[in-house]
């Protein structure tokens, strides 16, 4: 925790909930108030997170850790933008040749039974990391197992599986409506393995109305939590606009040409 004049010591909590499997993952909900913990032993548990104290509480066990007869291996995961769905990718065990991307409905009375397999990947293709991007879509990497040692790829190993990311276009929607499109985002000749960058959300903003939302000044300037970026800039005419409006706020996008003439307008 950080105050205006102090960096606090690390906060350590021992959950003591999964002790056998390696490769633990922690994934925070976009609003920062929940955290999901998964591991390769098939463990999945969600916690409340207090952004003011840095403490976790109220664990909700979704899947216990498996120590034998393994039937699931959670490799990566991410929340939907609305925080009500959780997407997990799995890896395969030695006697299984298939990995998956699975959607869970966190509002369901029985979350394990809400599992919806969006796609299965058969060896030599292996499911990798999945991440929520600033455009509110999910992007997923895959590894193509060409042989030992796996990394790096030889120049000759290029295909649709390792030169594209898969995309969930509408991750707030359940089932087929989320529009999972495998190997649909071309990387311009770059190739994927199991991972994707881990990019912290520095645009989350303050927890409005919370006990730690107390910093004031003599001349306080009230601003909305607005995120907006254009890339590349400058461009050749082809560019991407990413934006995130303040909660429950609308806006308008207007693009002007070099003479100041409006050439595009859209309500957001």
Per-region residue spans from a language model:
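Beta-propeller fold recognition
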Residues: 1-49, 55-62, 70-217
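C-terminal outer-membrane/trafficking sorting elements
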Residues: 222-268
């Amino acid at each position: 925790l950080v105050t205006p004049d102090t960096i606090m010591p690390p906060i350590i909590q021992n959950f003591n909930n999964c002790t056998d499997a390696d490769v633990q993952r922690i994934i925070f909900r976009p609003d920062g108030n929940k955290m999901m913990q998964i591991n390769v032993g098939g463990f999945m548990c969600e916690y409340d997170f207090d952004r003011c104290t840095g403490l976790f509480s109220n664990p909700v066990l979704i899947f216990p850790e498996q120590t034998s007869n393994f039937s699931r291996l959670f490799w990566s995961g991410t929340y939907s933008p609305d925080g009500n769905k959780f997407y997990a990718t799995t890896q395969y065990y030695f006697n299984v040749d298939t990995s998956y991307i699975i959607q869970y409905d966190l509002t369901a009375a029985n979350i394990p039974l809400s599992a919806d397999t969006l796609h299965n990947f058969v060896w030599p293709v292996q499911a990798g990391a999945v991440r929520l991007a600033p455009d509110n879509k999910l992007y997923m990497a895959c590894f193509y197992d060409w042989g030992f040692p796996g990394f790096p790829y030889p120049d000759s190993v290029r295909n649709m599986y390792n030169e594209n990311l898969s995309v969930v276009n509408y991750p707030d929607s359940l089932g087929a409506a989320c529009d999972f499109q495998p190997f649909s985002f071309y990387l311009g000749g770059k190739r994927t393995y199991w991972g994707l960058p881990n990019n912290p959300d520095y645009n989350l903003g303050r927890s409005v109305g919370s006990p730690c939302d107390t910093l004031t000044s003599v001349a306080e300037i009230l601003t909305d939590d607005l995120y907006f970026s254009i890339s590349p800039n400058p461009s050749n005419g082809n560019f991407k606009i990413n934006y995130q409006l303040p909660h429950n706020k609308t806006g308008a996008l207007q693009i002007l040409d070099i003479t100041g003439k409006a050439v595009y307008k859209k309500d957001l």
